[in-house]
Amino acid sequence: MTKSGNIETLFSLLDDENETVAVSAMKELLRHENELPEYLAAFQEDDDPLVRRRVHQLQVVLYLRRSRREFSRKLQSPFIDVPDCLLALHLLWFDNDVMPGVAQLWQDFAAAAGNYPLDSLEDLAYFMHKCNFRPMPESTLYPENYCMGTVLEKRVGAASLLLVMLREVASLRPLTLGRLLGEFVLQDESGRLLLPLRNWQIASVNNGQALEYWDNRKFFTFAAYNLFSSAVNSDSFRYILTLAQALNGTDGDGVLSALPYPYNPGKEKTAD
């Protein structure tokens, strides 16, 4: 049987009322990922609501796979496009959000920044105060604080994320993201620091205090791992798999092999 014939046969099973049969067919269809879109487009308006539902499920799986690969690709790129990575990170967690809508929030933020002089740390602090941004400590308990769209809507976000966003729209250069005594800061060329968790105060590094410098790749990896930890905290297998695959750059379930039961079904539950 030709590949197209095999795919058509599998699609013919999507109306089967036996869930096991349909799930098996869907699993096989996902092996033909590159050929699926044209078939899904043809079946998404099928008269049978059961077929439409299962076609939608397949479309969601393909979308999630693309999102994971896209984030992984961006993370491994020699040059990291910050707005694109912020958008990709947001969509890993809020995967029902629409990309253009979230992207528009960033464009509005960048446009607002263009109305302010952002040539000094004082300018940056003033801008963030005027925008009513509230920086929060780094935490795995509030995953939304690492999601650009939610942060821009609610004006509350992880200090690290706010600094990465601010540095991207600032005209002051160079600006370095760093961590000092556990808190994220921005450092200008003269060595002064912008401290978001200290009400956007400006200070200098004291003698003996070592500033740990962070590049974009390190930040986005850190943020994605925090989202992964949030998924574990909430016992959300779907997001555990999504974040693990995005960080690992693969679609397989093998990324869960290092995790304990029940996330890795191959490991039996052991007694305490």
Regions found by a protein language model. Give the residues of each.
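A structural boundary/capping signal
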Residues: T2-D272
